[in-house]
Amino acid sequence: MADKKKITASLIYAVSVAAIGSLQFGYNTGVINAPEKIIQAFYNRTLSQRSGETISPELLTSLWSLSVAIFSVGGMIGSFSVSLFFNRFGRRNSMLLVNVLAFAGGALMALSKIAKAVEMLIIGRFIIGLFCGLCTGFVPMYISEVSPTSLRGAFGTLNQLGIVVGILVAQIFGLEGIMGTEALWPLLLGFTIVPAVLQCVALLFCPESPRFLLINKMEEEKAQTVLQKLRGTQDVSQDISEMKEESAKMSQEKKATVLELFRSPNYRQPIIISITLQLSQQLSGINAVFYYSTGIFERAGITQPVYATIGAGVVNTVFTVVSLFLVERAGRRTLHLVGLGGMAVCAAVMTIALALKEKWIRYISIVATFGFVALFEIGPGPIPWFIVAELFSQGPRPAAMAVAGCSNWTSNFLVGMLFPYAEKLCGPYVFLIFLVFLLIFFIFTYFKVPETKGRTFEDISRGFEEQVETSSPSSPPIEKNPMVEMNSIEPDKEVA
């Protein structure tokens, strides 16, 4: 089988370098939590010296909330701007260019203490948010386009692995014994410059996406050379043939704008699936679990809950690796269903444990917490990011990634803003809200989400088109082909 290529050093190198962008996203998501009190003291001291008056607790809380939330605002804008870069500059060059934002944001945050400027830190967080928003679109798309069909899901999971490793590194670096101190917190925030430098240098030796070269730039010879290097074989005729077929189809289609994704019947179902899967990630309650984890561990008698939280981060990382090996065996749809269903059970257990407050059940709540995190990384964590790239052909893919990424960042922002109020109103029963969401997303996934394992981009797109033709009253009914049956739990056989 032509798709059963060996895993080459060039392929591993390309996807690993791209995943540094995901690591940046994870690091900058988690880095702000540990030094919260130290940075608030910096805000208080700096603004008091500047105004000559004591800063009110309300203003301090508002400034801190802004510092946290502005990252997501930047992410929303950045993720929605993905399509402006990818077709103009290419996949690799886009990742290279946006590291300028990482340098600027990291420098502003690192120098904010010396400059005694609270504004620098907040603006730096916004710029880093822009950068991370762009990365959440660039990385999964690049990885999906350089990977062979049979390994696309496994390598796509590296995007989520980069995110969770970044969060774990931020948690560890944020410990008081490392960089979570009054003297070193600017370095903790500015450390994001280091992986940016590494990625800039490494990207110079990465190939451009062969799909971009052939389909967008019409440079078949370059695409063939890149494919031969990535696949470790001279015979890449099947890949070239599949790309040419997709290119021919793309030339007959209207330009895929964001509005066209919702107007066109062929794109409407995949974009709704893409948005819903992104919402299933953010509305699953994973952020609430991390919010509650310290309290859960404290009630269980753990004297250093911060280390238990890091333990949850380790579980996060380990089960992302597990997902990497499972996704090409079990399939995307199955793992997403297992993750959502298992998380719903864990959410119910955590609700009971938090409500009863019995000593014996505290330890069950810890198991449920770790189980919730593990199941998140089996399905809802990694799959929504890379399945979007699989559901669309080359033309609409950048616009689809922009819409999906923006919906993820927007829901992340809303959960962050609204969760404290929901927690105050519902107390330990707040997880029931997420339980309802998990069940809704489980039902949606079961009935609407296709299995994409082992299928080419063109085959998946054709499946949606045939569904539209089947459901259209003006079109005669067509016989469903197992290769394009969109709601089948069983994955299709790999393309020979």
UniProtKB/Swiss-Prot annotation:
GO function terms (MF aspect): D-glucose binding; D-glucose transmembrane transporter activity; galactose transmembrane transporter activity
Organism (species): Gallus gallus
* GO BP term (any one): D-glucose import
Q: What does this protein do?
A: Facilitative glucose transporter. Can also mediate the uptake of various other monosaccharides across the cell membrane. Mediates the uptake of glucose, 2-deoxyglucose, galactose, mannose, xylose and fucose, and probably also dehydroascorbate. Does not mediate fructose transport. Required for mesendoderm differentiation.
Residue ranges annotated as Extracellular topological domain: 34-65, 113-119, 176-184, 292-305, 354-362, 420-428
Pfam families per the UniProt record, alphabetical:
Sugar_tr
Query: NCBIfam families, per this entry?
Result: SP
Q: Which domain of life is it from?
A: Eukaryota
User: Which residues take part in binding D-glucose?
Assistant: Q160, Q281, Q282, N287, N316, E377, W385
**Full protein name:** Solute carrier family 2, facilitated glucose transporter member 3
Any known activators or inhibitors?
A: Deoxyglucose transport is inhibited by D-glucose, D-galactose and maltose. Galactose transport is inhibited by D-glucose and maltose.
Q: What is known of its domains?
A: Transport is mediated via a series of conformation changes, switching between a conformation where the substrate-binding cavity is accessible from the outside, and a another conformation where it is accessible from the cytoplasm.
User: So which residues have sugars stuck on them?
Assistant: N44
Q: Does the keyword Transport apply?
A: yes
Q: How does it sit in the membrane?
A: Multi-pass membrane protein
* Keyword terms: Cell membrane, Cell projection, Glycoprotein, Membrane, Sugar transport, Transmembrane, Transmembrane helix, Transport
* Segments for region (Important for selectivity against fructose): 278-280
Give the Cytoplasmic membrane side ranges. Answer: 1-11, 87-91, 144-154, 206-270, 327-332, 389-398, 450-496
Q: Which family does it belong to?
A: Belongs to the major facilitator superfamily. Sugar transporter (TC 2.A.1.1) family. Glucose transporter subfamily.
Which residue spans traverse the membrane?
Answer: 12-33, 66-86, 92-112, 120-143, 155-175, 185-205, 271-291, 306-326, 333-353, 363-388, 399-419, 429-449
Region described as Disordered: 464-496
Cellular compartments per GO CC: cell projection; extracellular space; membrane; perikaryon; plasma membrane
